[in-house]
Amino acid sequence: MATTVSPAGVAPAEGQTAAAAPVPLKKDPRYQALRNFALSISVFNIFGYTLLGWEQPYIWPFFAVLTAYATEFVFELLSAWAQHRQPAFRTKDPRAFMLFWLPAHITGLACNMLLYANNQWWPVMFAVIIAVSQKHVLRAPIAGRMRHFMNPSNFGISVTLLTLGTWVSISPPYQFTEWANSYFKLMIPMVILTAGTVLNAMLTKKTALIVGWMGGFAIQAFVRHWIFGVQLNTALGVMTGVAFVLFSNYMVTDPATTPTKFLPKFMFGSSLAAVYGILMAFNIVYTLFFALCIVCACRGLGWWAAHFIAKRRESRAAVTSPQPSAIPGQAVTT
C-alpha cells in the first residue's frame, strides 16, 4: 500500500496514512568502548616505540594491523556466504562500519605488542591470523546468539607460544620501561592503571571482574606462600609490573568474551586467579595467557552444555505433553 504525505499543516485525508517519522538508529554501547580502547592502545604503541624502548621493529605494528584487517575481511566474507547474510562491513552506518574493524585493529596491535620473535616477523603474523580467525570458528550459543567465547588476542598468543616456542616468546617485561628513568618508571603503571580503570568502570562495566581477579591473585599468592613456601614479595610483586597492569585492564576485560552480570563477572576474575595459582604450582610458564585460555574455554563449554540441556528438556517436554482430546463432531488433525 502506498503512503501519501500531506502538505505541512494539512491533516491527512481519510484513507491516507501519514508518513512515519524516521526512527534514529540506536547507538551500540560497544562502539565507544572499542573506539577508546583502540585509541588508547594505539597511543601506547606510539609512546612505546618512541619513549619506552620497545624492541620490535617499527614496521611490525603496521604489518600486524594490516594482517588483522585482511584476515577479518576474508573470514567475514566466508561467514556471510555460509550463513546467507550480508557481510557486516557492508553498511551505510559509519559507526557499524568502524565497529567491524576496531576489534581487528586492537588484536593486531596487542599481538605485536606482547610477542617477541627477534627478527622473525611471521610468528607474530601467525598469532594475528589465529586470533582473528578463531572468532568465526570457536563459537557458542551465548544468551540466545552464536558468539565467540575465546579472548582473541590471548588465544592467538597462547597458540603461538605452544606451537612456535622455538622462534617466539612473550615480550620481555623490562621493555615497557626500558628507556624511562626512576620517576618516569613509577608514573607509567600509574597512568596505565588509571586510564584502564576509568575505561573499564565507565564503558565496559568490568569493575567486578577486575576486583575478583586482583583480589583472587593476592589470595593465591598468600596460599602459595603458606603451602609451598613461595616468597610472598615475589608472588605479590608481579602485580606492580606494567605487563600485569596491561593484562588486567586491557586483556582480561574483553567485553565480548567475559560475562555481563555482576556475580558472573566476579566469578570469572576469581576463577582466573585460581587457575593461575594452580598452573604456577606446576611451574608452567606463560601462566597468565594459558590461565585465561582455560577459563574462557570452560565458559564456552559451559554455554554449550547449557544449550544441550535446554534442548533435551524441550524434546522431553514435547514427547510427554498430552495430546488434545477429540471434540464430538470435530475431526482431530495430526
Where are these regions (language model features)?
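N-terminal signal-anchor module of multipass membrane proteins
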Residues: 2-84, 88-89
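Membrane-embedded alpha-helical segments in integral membrane proteins
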Residues: 19-22, 37-55, 72-73, 106-113, ...
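C-terminal transmembrane helix-loop-helix hairpin of multi-pass membrane proteins
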Residues: 20-42, 220-329, 334
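C-terminal ends of transmembrane helices
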Residues: 22, 71-92, 131-146, 193-205, ...
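Alpha-helical transmembrane segments in multi-pass membrane proteins
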Residues: 40, 63-76, 103-111, 123, ...
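Structural signature of hydrophobic alpha-helical transmembrane segments
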Residues: 56-67, 117-129, 174-190, 232-244
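Membrane-interface helix-loop-helix junctions at boundaries between adjacent transmembrane segments
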Residues: 86-181
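Internal active-site segments that recognize and position negatively charged phosphoryl groups
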Residues: 164-218
